[in-house]
């Protein structure tokens, strides 16, 4: 899974599960702040990846990345979400709390952490 796809999933999962607008992320693996925003209303996600200048979103469980022209599934389950990135062919699981998203990328076989800035 691309690093920007992990960030997109983290922002979308947080918006879906916590119910607040995401105004940015800090990617611990990359060591940098990401310009990414996301919100969810009535099971519909809308987001913007400012670093790539592209939108993403869709009606759950399907999200579409306008930049990569690919679909990613996102299925909420309590305080976590799971899904599949069709571009990479890999699954993921995300654990979400008020200010943190931890995402396990099965393609990389490891965890990634994102601090969340709430709008």
Stretches with model-predicted labels:
Residues 2-119:
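Repetitive, compositionally biased segments used for assembly/scaffolding
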